[in-house]
């Protein structure tokens, strides 16, 4: 299995510790540890350098670096220390921007951002932990900082009720903070991500974007979540009770945001997924994933990996497998796709449905269930029972990995159509496809409905 190394060690030598000395050090206490923010500086080392700030705002930023070669941790040299930004300033947020470490959100200085000296190369003895050297400084804003993000040439500063950008951080004569808007703020810094060339974040009135324009240095605000405004409204109304986390799955062009209370159950944890399509964002909800922290990136082979962690300290491979495993226990995944109510262009005509054909894109063997409801689920008219669809197998390619005769299905399409006869009639109808099992994932591509008009009133 995987090997874990605790990195918050105390009294590490300035020149670094070998593996034996480092693992033998006492633990560096992280008082009131809460959700953390990570900043990674690639630098000149093989493994980069990492800075960790804590939203509990009870500790200084933690700095960690590892050097050396070889596949075993025992061949490495380890560096660890706490960063003194300014006295007892304990920032909550951190980011690397244009050769600087930038931090903000300290409880004692909520309106102030601090930036380190300029990071150029090792010959200048540049140090991520130095907030007093050449090029370092601080700026006080008019609003409380809730998040920071490097975006193109600017540092975007998200505040409670406004958004700013920091320009020319490396030019002392022209460094400036310019307002983007003083009417829109960010509800939680952990919602900020970059996807499709834009920044997205959770605001009081929805998921908003900050996008670059054709004009150099110009940005514009947009809104992309009108379809799920009721969900966003409920989330925004209670945002202070939730732990927010978010990430971007690049291979799927998806923005994912999760929210749950500090003591809530995994089963009750929720989230939203925004997928970029040619027609803009398409949205869905998640249930049963407790992600108090989540991250996505590429491994050494260029393969995207995503992990999340829950309140009990379990780390999970995200978006993999056919079932959830909260605390190591296999649990069904509940999936549901709901259509609007269709009147087929004439709400006054009663329609008798004969059958429907549904296009799926399965990732393995699946057998979902279909539910048809008439006239906005009117309880005063007969509603048909649920239909268990025919089992759908993943199509196989001859010679493919894991393909065996008498087991794999050959000659099938990647997006099979399933025909299901249905009963009932109404002026409108809706369809729900759902499953509660440990079978493979699937996408619903579309419907074909065959019906006959059966009267008008």
Regions found by a protein language model. Give the residues of each.
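Beta-sheet repeat architectures centered on beta-propellers
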Residues: 1-19, 23-45, 183-198, 204-457
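Beta-propeller and closely related beta-pinwheel folds
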Residues: 11, 17-33, 71-243, 280-290
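Hydrophobic or amphipathic alpha-helical targeting/insertion segments
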Residues: 33-81
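Hydrophobic beta-strand segments that make up the repeating blades of beta-propeller
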Residues: 50-52, 155, 199, 306-307
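Structural motif
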Residues: 53-56, 106, 259-261
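Generic beta-strand hydrophobic packing signal
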Residues: 59-61, 75-80, 94, 148, ...
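A short loop-to-beta-strand structural motif that recurs across blades of beta-propeller domains
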Residues: 60-62, 162, 206, 314
């Amino acid at each position: 299995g995987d090997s874990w190394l605790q990195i918050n060690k105390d009294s590490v030598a300035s020149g670094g510790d070998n593996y034996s000395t480092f693992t033998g050090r006492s633990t560096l206490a992280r008082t009131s540890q809460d959700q953390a923010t990570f900043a990674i500086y690639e630098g000149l080392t093989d493994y980069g350098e990492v800075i960790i700030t804590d939203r509990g705002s009870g500790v200084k930023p933690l700095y960690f670096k590892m050097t050396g070669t070889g596949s075993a941790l025992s061949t490495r040299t380890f560096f660890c220390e706490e960063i003194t930004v300014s006295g007892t300033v304990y920032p909550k947020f951190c980011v690397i921007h244009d050769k600087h470490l930038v931090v903000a959100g300290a409880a004692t200085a909520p309106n102030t951002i601090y930036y380190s000296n300029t990071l150029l190369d090792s010959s200048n003895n540049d140090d991520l932990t130095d907030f007093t050297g050449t090029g370092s400084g601080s700026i006080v804003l008019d609003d409380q900082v809730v998040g920071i993000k490097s975006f193109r040439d600017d540092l975007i500063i998200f505040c409670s009720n406004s958004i700013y950008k920091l320009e020319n951080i490396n030019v002392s004569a022209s460094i400036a903070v310019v307002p983007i808007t003083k009417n829109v703020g960010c509800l939680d810094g952990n919602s900020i991500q970059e996807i499709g060339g834009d920044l997205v974040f959770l605001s009081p009135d929805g998921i908003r974007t900050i996008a670059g324009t054709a004009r150099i240095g110009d940005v514009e605000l947009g809104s992309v979540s009108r379809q799920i405004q009721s969900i966003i409204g409920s989330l925004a109304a209670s945002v202070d009770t939730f732990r927010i986390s978010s990430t971007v799955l690049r291979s799927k062009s998806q923005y994912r945001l999760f929210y749950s209370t500090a003591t809530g159950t995994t089963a009750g944890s929720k989230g939203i997924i925004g997928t970029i399509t040619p027609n803009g964002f398409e949205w869905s909800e998640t249930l049963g994933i407790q992600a108090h922290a989540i991250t996505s990136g590429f491994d050494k082979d260029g393969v995207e990996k995503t992990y999340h962690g829950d309140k009990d300290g379990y780390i999970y491979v995200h978006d993999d497998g056919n079932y959830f495993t909260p605390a190591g226990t296999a649990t069904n995944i509940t999936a549901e796709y709901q259509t609007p109510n269709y009147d087929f262009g004439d709400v006054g005509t009663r329609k008798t449905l004969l059958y429907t054909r549904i296009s799926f894109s399965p990732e393995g063997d699946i057998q979902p269930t279909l539910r048809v409801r008439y006239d906005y689920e009117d309880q005063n008219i007969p509603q048909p029972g649920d239909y268990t669809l025919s089992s759908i197998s993943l199509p196989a390619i001859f010679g493919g990995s894991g393909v065996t005769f008498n087991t794999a299905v050959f000659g099938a399409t990647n997006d099979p159509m399933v025909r299901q006869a249905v009963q009932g009639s109404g002026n409108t109808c809706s369809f729900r496809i759902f499953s509660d099992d440990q079978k493979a994932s699937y996408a619903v591509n579309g419907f074909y409905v065959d019906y006959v008009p059966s009267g008008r009133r």
